[in-house]
Amino acid sequence: MNDNKATGWKIPLLFCGVVLAIVCIVSVFRGGKAAPPAVPAPLLRQAEAITIDLDADAEGKAWKARIASAASGFSAPQNKDANLDKIILTSLEKKRFDASCTAAVLIRDDSLRDALLARILETASTECASLPWGVLAAHGMRDPNAQSAAHARLTREWGKCHEGKE
């Protein structure tokens, strides 16, 4: 009788255990990204209350159609991003923050998206009433440094808007 049992399972099991241990150790010691500074709570509540509904009026429906046309089709992502870029700049001129925020989240290039969201923030920061749109723009940014700078600006602008009121 032959007692050759299958013993080849020990080495792969040990290998998996070592890999799992390394992954766990790295995840524990890896520094997480710092959370951006918080925006003032009343401003955040105003931003959370915003509902984007481009179907609410005829002009919004036209913006929605332009955005859908620019973001779809068989063209290269760079071309789609360029078309969305034009739509965002045009909608910002007309102070249609709903259209500009909708188009901005569809941009695939992270650096372009962050730059355009910063532009939305800049335009929204010119008036106290449009400041909540800046919060939406800041939350759409992917770069943590840009997001921190945006939150700091929002806090500053909110303070200017409410200086003598509190």
Where are these regions (language model features)?
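Short, low-complexity patches enriched in S/T/P/G
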Residues: 2-12
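Non-catalytic tandem-repeat scaffold regions and their flanking low-complexity/translocation tails
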Residues: 10-166
